[in-house]
Amino acid sequence: MKIAVRLDDITPDMDWERFLKFKALLDKYQVKPLIGVVPDNRDDNLKGSRQGAPDDFWAYVRELQSQGWSVAMHGYRHIYSTDKGGIFPLNNFSEFAGVSYEEQLRMLTGGKRMLAEKGIETDIFMAPAHSYDNNTIKALIESGFNKITDGFGDAPYIWKGITFYPISFRLSDTLKKKSGYSTMVVHAGTIREKEWQGYESYFQRQDATWINYSEYMSLKPYKRGIGGRITEYLLAKAKSVLVNHLR
């Protein structure tokens, strides 16, 4: 299977020590990921060590983009304001799901404008907590987005005018598959010391091909029907229940 990488929670005040350590892994194995940049971070939980932080965060992001890294808008302020899981219910909290269309449109256009003012253009959305609803889809299209990094499956698909780039349901199973495409989701700021070796072992596996996210986005998507969407919803709900049960 060919696997791309996405890094969530990219902010000026994130844990730079961990981020740069993971970046070193990506550089070593020549993988250019998708990074989810929060336009106006207000979530204190995303803050961490400033060791190694660049003087100009936005210039740094632009430089990564010029080197072939892909950039998504990761929500607006990364503040969870509802207890809704939306149409991809991996979690029961959200910045977007359950919020009115008008407010979602305001957040999306505002966030996109903030990024543009910093010289960062993007048309791909990364929902905080993976949670979004039908109003999000409608507002994304209205505000100039046409891609979402989320969903389950083995290839990009189109639904309601948006192209979805699926993430891994369970990485251990994804790594064993012989064909298809998926995404490994990484929150570098929360990686524990004992987990670093595991991440390197993933990149060293002979049965997985690691690709740049730009290659993933170059694939022609297929059209997914209602049956596929229902299956995806049920899988996300089942995974949410299982994860909560194990906590």
Question: Model regions: which residues?
Answer:
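Generic structural signal for well-ordered alpha-helices
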Residues: 19-23, 58-62, 105-112, 137, ...
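C-terminal domain-boundary segment and adjacent tail
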Residues: 33-37, 190-247
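Short, flexible, mixed-charge acidic loops at enzyme active sites
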Residues: 79-91
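Active-site beta->alpha N-cap acidic-glycine motif
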Residues: 1-67, 114
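Catalytic domains of cell-wall/extracellular-matrix polysaccharide-remodeling enzymes
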Residues: 95-166, 196-197
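Hydrophobic faces of well-ordered beta-strands that scaffold small-molecule active sites
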Residues: 3-7, 33-35, 71-74, 122-125, ...
